[in-house]
Every structure is written in C-alpha cells, then in structure tokens.
From Swiss-Prot:
PROSITE patterns: AP_NUCLEASE_F2_1, AP_NUCLEASE_F2_2, AP_NUCLEASE_F2_3, AP_NUCLEASE_F2_4. It catalyses: Endonucleolytic cleavage to 5'-phosphooligonucleotide end-products. Zn(2+) 3 binds at H181, D226, H228. Its cofactor is Zn(2+). Gene3D superfamilies: Divalent-metal-dependent TIM barrel enzymes. HAMAP family: Nfo. Pfam families: AP_endonuc_2. Binds 3 Zn(2+) ions. This is Probable endonuclease 4. Zn(2+) 1 binds at H68, H109, E144. NCBIfam families: nfo, PRK01060.1-1. GO terms for biological process: base-excision repair. It comes from Enterococcus faecalis (strain ATCC 700802 / V583). The gene is nfo.
Length: 297
C-alpha cells in the first residue's frame, strides 16, 4: 500500500532528509514542496542531495513520491496578468526539478479567477498550461480538486474536465483528489465515495486519477471552507477515509496525509503522521489518538 504524508525538504539534507522523515512515520511514499510553499525561492537541482535521497528511498521501500507546486502560483488570474509569465516559467522549472527528483506527479492548485468568473479563469489556466507543458516531460501536472473557497477553480469535476479538454498536450495532465476538498465542495465522501468515483469516471476518467490527498474535514459537506482535520476527528470520519485508503480501485495510487499537527501551542505541535499511518494500516479507529500524538517526545 502506498501511504505517506507531506514531509519537509530543507537544510543540507534536502531529499535525504525528506526520505528519512517519511521512513520514521512508517511511510511507503511521501510528498514534498521543492522549497517553502509560500514563496518561489528554490535551491539549484545539484543542491537537492538527490543521489543520497534516492539511495535511502530504495533501501527503505519508498516510491511514487509527489511534488506539490507552491500555492502562490495562480495561472487563473486575468486581472493581474503581469504575474502570468513568471508563473509559467516557474512551473516549467518545477517540472524539471520534479523530474530530477524522480517524481512523476506534480500536484497543482489550478488557480483562482479573482472575480473575473470561472470561464475566464479556466481559459487563462488552459493558456498557461499550453505554455508550460512540453512533449518530452515525464512528470504530469496533477490538477487538484478544490473546496471552492473564494474564487478557486476546480471546485467541480466539470471545471477540471474543462481545463483538461482545453489543453493540447493533455496526456501530461492528471488529477489529485483531496478528500477534504471534495467534501467541502459538496461531494459525499462520507456515505457514497463509490458514487463519487463513478461521477469522477464519467466526467474526467479514472485513468487520470494519480494522487489521493487523505484528509478529514473540520467543516460540513458543501461548506466551501477547506480546513483539514486529523483522520477520524472530522466530519468525514475514520470509516469513510479508511475505505478510501484501502479502496480496490486506488491500490496503485500514492495516498498522502496533509492533516494538521497536534498541540495547544504553536511551539509544541507534534506531527500526527506516524500515528495516523499505523491506524490506517490497522484499519481500527483509535479515539485516543490525539492524546498519543501530543504525548510523543
């Protein structure tokens, strides 16, 4: 089973440090940002410690890693077009970085229309992706399903399908499905995930689904909020998310946890991932999980 979490990539260790963190959680896969998600400053590829990282991954059965593009990249903005060229250039470089790291999927928030309307935003995203993608690239851009907060595009499968249909080299496009986001967008993950997959297959095609973000939600279905909760402690619940992780149609896909760190004060928050991964492997909900996470050294 390909199950892991978001891990950091920083310092001198870079990819090796990410792989070590993932292994410490009992992961078989992981997701990284190539630098801080809130900015676009990036180290050169030769400083990412790729050889040592990949050797460690091989030894510890870690594979199918995912890169997450920074969320400040907005291809959908038709209001402030001066940032468009930069976003296109950055994404092209991100594909090169992902390829060097050995990742075949780059999760990307499609963008926001910032008031111009979804149609204008979709058109602009299509234009951007047509400039970004090239025939020889190996990694796919995995457009993420969004919660529909503000003017986000990708709140429905139809919006993602419209982007995919508009892009010339759309064999380079795939989809990241986030359980919290689609719940908050109005899809019934809790009681009818099979129905959600049927709808996804009809509109986009299950063959495009390449990454799953496994998150519970702090908000009710259809709230358009996007606030992640720890597994089993939100409105989706453990049973449904365990069903997603162990779903027979999703066996080959990396499942990535992006659940919140646990703790009352910011300085002492603890990573939940080792505990949540173990719980999902055991397929039994632990109501005392949050206390156990907080109690770790």
């Amino acid at each position: 089973m390909l199950l892991g979490s978001h891990v950091s990539m920083s310092g001198k260790k870079m990819l090796l440090g990410s792989a070590e963190e993932a292994a410490s959680y009992g992961s078989t896969t992981f997701m990284i940002y190539t630098g801080a998600p809130q900015n676009t400053r990036r180290k050169p590829i030769e400083e990412m410690n790729i050889e040592a990282g990949q050797a460690f991954m091989k030894e510890h059965n870690l594979s199918n890693i995912v890169v997450h593009a920074p969320y400040i990249i907005n291809l959908g903005n038709t209001i402030k077009t001066e940032n468009f060229g930069f976003a296109v250039d950055f994404l092209r470089q991100e594909i090169e970085r992902a390829q060097a790291l050995g990742a075949t999927q780059i999760t990307l928030h499609p963008g926001a229309h910032v008031g111009a309307g979804p149609e204008a935003g979709i058109k602009q995203i299509v234009k951007g992706l047509n400039e970004v993608l090239w025939k020889e690239q190996i990694p796919q851009i995995a457009l993420e399903t969004m919660a529909g907060k503000g003017t986000e595009i990708g709140r429905t499968f139809d919006e993602l399908a419209a982007i995919i249909d508009g892009v010339t080299l759309n064999d380079k496009l795939s989809v990241t499905l986030d359980t919290c986001h689609i719940n908050d967008a109005g899809y019934n993950v809790k009681d009818d995930f099979d129905g959600v997959l049927v709808e996804f297959d009809k509109i986009i095609g299950l063959d495009r689904l390449k990454v799953i973000h496994v998150n519970d939600s702090k908000n009710p279905m259809g709230s358009h909020k996007d606030r992640h909760a720890n597994i089993g402690f939100g409105t989706i619940g453990f049973e449904a998310l365990n069903g997603v992780v162990h779903h027979e149609k999703l066996t080959a896909l990396p499942k990535i946890l992006e659940t919140p760190y646990v703790g009352e004060d910011k300085k002492n928050k603890k990573a939940p991932y080792g505990f949540e991964i173990a719980m999902l492997k055991n397929q039994t909900f632990d109501p005392e999980l949050l206390e156990k996470i907080q109690g770790q050294n």
